[in-house]
Amino acid sequence: LPPDTTTIDLRVILGSATSPGRMHRALDGAIERAAARGTSADLIDLGTLDLGFAAGTPLGDLDDDSAATVAAIESAGAVILATPIYRGSLSGSLKNLIDLTPVPALQGKVVGLVAMGASDHHFLGAERHLRDVLAFFGAVVMPVAVYLNGTDFVDGVPGERAETVLDQLFAGVAATAAALDGVEALEEPLALGAKAVKPRARATG
């Protein structure tokens, strides 16, 4: 890929609940290659953090990594959400972080998607569910997601295809975010634009 002339900071969120493994290694390599092209990116692996459970508690009251992680998303120029497939969908740890994240943190922000499963049977599961959730936030989701499976790795090392599609996604996210930089969203997302519904008066007599 050609050098990247954008100045967008990417945050790569890996929604893993286990110790760093193949997906961590693949994303870490993609970040290094992006840096060589001039794109600044960093990896936040949820498997290495202590995040509170999204139970309505204000972020400032959580004595863990939740507030700092959400702040990293808020300050990002663009975000890449990566998840292993669990039960045909995204991981619970990533969904929990999304539940902790306020709507303005992702509103109008470019988001790329990466998922990984043992086979191709569930390649649309996490993508479909994440697109539904991100539409609620009013995020700008890249039209093509990356899906990796076991055949994309040899002895835990990502192969040529994995590196190529990740590099294309990183470059596409950075370019799209740069193109939209300063462009105000046309409409509020559903989460902010919905009006409260008043209860109907009960009929009498």
Sequence positions of predicted segments:
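Glycine-rich phosphate/pyrophosphate-binding loop and the adjoining helix
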Residues: D61, V141-G205
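Helix-loop-strand module that forms the ligand-binding subsite of alpha/beta enzymes
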Residues: D61-F137
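Residue-level recognition of beta-strand->loop/alpha-helix junctions
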Residues: L14, D45, A145-Y147
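Cofactor-binding loop segments of dinucleotide-utilizing enzymes, especially the Rossmann-like FAD-
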Residues: G15-A17, L46, M116-G117
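N-terminal beta-loop-helix "entrance" segment that forms/cooperates
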Residues: L46-D63, V154-P158
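N-terminal beta1-alpha1 ligand-phosphate binding loop
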Residues: P2-T39
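Hydrophobic/aromatic residues located in beta-strands of well-ordered beta-sheets
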Residues: L10, A41, V111, V141-M142
